[in-house]
C-alpha cells in the first residue's frame, strides 16, 4: 500500500531580515465587522496569541485579514510576511522573533520557564479542542457564530454555504478523531472549567502569570486562549458564567484588554482585589 505523501513547508528563516523598524505583516482571521468585533479581535486563539505578543512587546506590524487558511504556507493561520517571505506557526514565529529582537522571557528562572511551558501545552493542546468543539461541532455554537459572522449560513449563496458546510464537516471529523467530541457536553464543560480554574490558581494575586512586574510570552498564550470565554457568553454560556467568577484570571483578562486592546470593550465586570 502506497502512503500519501503530504507536502511540507520549511520556514525560510535565513531569507527574512527583521529589526526594530521592520513592519511585519500579521496574517490572521479577524472577527469581521459585527457587534462581536467590539469585544474580541479574532476567534482564532493562535492569532490572538501572536497579535498579543506583538502588542505586548512593541513589535511593529500591520494586520492582514485572511478568509481561509488555504493561503497559509502550511495551510495554517496565523502566519507572518516580510516582503515576499512567509513564516508560519505562532510558536515558531515567536521563537524566531525572540532570537532577532530580544527575548522577553530571558529573566525567568528555569522553574518559571517550565511552568509556562506546561501552561502553554494545556491551553494549546487541550483547551484548544474545546474551542474548536464550540466553533464547529456544537450546533448552538456553530449557529451563533455563523449568525454573527455572516448573518446565518442559510442566507448565503449556495456555493458559499456549501463551502462552509464542508469546512464544518472537516472540523467536526477532526474533533471526533481527536476525541473531544466523544465526550458529553457536560463533560466538556467540566474539562474547560478545570483548565481555567487551574490558570486562575497559578496567577493568584499577581498581575501576570509569572510575576507582577512585566508580561512574558506565556501571558500572550493565556490571553489568546481564554479571552473569548470571558467576552462571548452566547457561544458557551455555562463556561462563561463559570470563568467570570474566577477573580485572578478575570482581572488578568481585564488588565491585558485595557492596556493592549484599548479599542475593545469588556463584556464583564472583573473582581476587584
Which stretches of residues belong to each language-model region?
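GST-like domain detector, emphasizing the conserved glutathione-binding G-site
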Residues: 2-162, 230
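Generic detection of long, well-ordered alpha-helical segments
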Residues: 44, 87, 106-113, 182-189, ...
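Amphipathic alpha-helical segments that form well-ordered structural scaffolds
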Residues: 49-56, 96, 191-202, 255
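Catalytic cores of nucleic-acid editing and processing enzymes
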Residues: 118, 122, 166-170, 184, ...
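GST-like fold's C-terminal all-alpha helical module
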Residues: 129-248
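Long, positively charged, glycine-interspersed low-complexity recognition regions
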Residues: 229-273
